[in-house]
Amino acid sequence: MPTSVTASSSWSQILEMLLEGQNLPEVEATALMEAWLAEQLTPVQTGAFLAALRAKGVTGNELSGMAQVLRGACPLPCPLPDIPMVDTCGTGGDGADTFNISTAVAFTAAACGANVAKHGNRSASGKVGSADVLEGLGLQLKAPLVSVVEALVEVGVTFLFAPAWHPALVNLAPLRRSLGVRTVFNLLGPLVNPLQPNAQVLGVAKAELLNPMAEALQRLGLQRAVVVHGAGGLDEASLEGANAMRLLENGHLRQASIDSAELGLTRAPLQALQGGDLATNQAILSAVLQGGGTAPQRDVVALNTALVLWAAGLQDDLQAGVSTAKTCLQEGLPWQRLEGLRMALDHQIGE
């Protein structure tokens, strides 16, 4: 049963709070999300709330309250695996048109020993999303949900196609598309992995999102996490300069930064990481995971993989993490993980 808005707070009063720049208590953010999922708000009300939240700027409390509702609405086909897990899902929206870096990182981190539950979707902007490129490489997006979970245990990596796990959001999709702007739902995507990993590397396209996203992960109970805003505005750690970070460890947040040059990597502009259409991004991802691609492409994957290995508790030294990732890439081990996942899901589809 959806939570009722408190007697003193009607929907119009909550909207007025947002329009005046006031932050919502977590309980009211929770009630708002529950009302959305229960279709209790009109399209006009929903559009107004989304616009007001975007204009005000979201807080960690608001994000965590909404995320908990969405997590609870996920259809879990089986008990959650009792293993440590890490996700590499970011917010997107940086406009840099890079290749699918976080997707490459997911398979590289798995090859380095992490259990990676990669949450992702198709692109909403006409670019190439993680689901688009993986489907193009033969990965089944419509595999039974239980098979997706089993693949994580079997292969060490899996891909959770967001629409399959969040059916409650289907009714909101047309309105979100009609608004034509990014909303709080774009920020919630990385926070609502159905398998609830205990670690995450989460890239944000804007520096002002570092704190609220990190605070949301903290409130959601993650053990370790990195929220990163890349030099040049990338929603990954980039090779262009100093990358701003918030590190979550044992319930505590701290600021940090890392420059790729400090880890022995050659600086490179964002243009060196450019992707393209689906065929181009498939070719780049295939090449990099098999030890090919350009030096900047491999280096940016190694850099971000090092952050994942830190978050997963596998490597506290980032320099060593970069070295481990480079070795895995040179040996083509990430491609083996992708092939293993593809075969595991194909097997289930065929049964």
Swiss-Prot record:
Mg(2+) 1 binds at residues 102, 236. Belongs to the anthranilate phosphoribosyltransferase family. Anthranilate 2 binds at residue 176. Keywords: Amino-acid biosynthesis, Aromatic amino acid biosynthesis, Glycosyltransferase, Magnesium, Metal-binding, Transferase, Tryptophan biosynthesis. The gene is trpD. It is an enzyme of class 2 (transferase). It comes from Prochlorococcus marinus (strain MIT 9313). One of its GO terms (biological process) is L-tryptophan biosynthetic process. The lineage of its organism: Bacteria, Bacillati, Cyanobacteriota, Cyanophyceae, Synechococcales. Anthranilate 1 binds at residues 90, 121. GO terms for cellular component: cytosol. GO terms for molecular function: anthranilate phosphoribosyltransferase activity; magnesium ion binding. Pathway: Amino-acid biosynthesis; L-tryptophan biosynthesis; L-tryptophan from chorismate: step 2/5. NCBIfam families: trpD. Its cofactor is Mg(2+). Catalyzes the transfer of the phosphoribosyl group of 5-phosphorylribose-1-pyrophosphate (PRPP) to anthranilate to yield N-(5'-phosphoribosyl)-anthranilate (PRA). Its EC number is 2.4.2.18. Binds 2 magnesium ions per monomer. It catalyses: N-(5-phospho-beta-D-ribosyl)anthranilate + diphosphate = 5-phospho-alpha-D-ribose 1-diphosphate + anthranilate. 5-phospho-alpha-D-ribose 1-diphosphate binds at residues 90, 93-94, 98, 100-103, 118-126, 130. This is Anthranilate phosphoribosyltransferase. HAMAP family: TrpD. Homodimer. Mg(2+) 2 binds at residues 235-236.
